Amino acid sequence: MSEAPKRSEKSADYKKAVAKQRRIKKLRKMKIKDRAGDVVVSDISDVEVVGNGDEESQDDWLNDLLKSDGDGGKAGPVDPSHPMETTTTDHSSQNTLASKICAFTYDNSALLGVGIVTVALSIFARLRK
């Protein structure tokens, strides 16, 4: 075990030694707490269990994923022999986040260019300091 730092040492060395002693002491306390199993059950947030808590099979999980609730294709079990159906959408009526971003950048390209140049210049100015 290391000795306690002596005050007669240089002030910088003394401060470093004291800080090191504190870190070691803190780490020892953490290790002791970890060994004791100090995790309190009330610290863990409540977890809601859906169903009876059993793990569902992979087929059930896949079928649930493929239900027609917006995130899947067709309702019902997966039939590997059935050909895949594709749907096409009219791209002019599609109003996604990506299309909004593209429209904004197209309309405000000069303004965005000035903003990018300003940010780049400020970064370079800070790097030169």
UniProtKB/Swiss-Prot annotation:
Region (Disordered): 52-94
Biased composition (Polar residues): 84-94
Biased composition range(s): Acidic residues: 53-62
Record protein name field: Uncharacterized protein C06G4.4
High-level lineage: Eukaryota, Metazoa, Ecdysozoa, Nematoda, Chromadorea
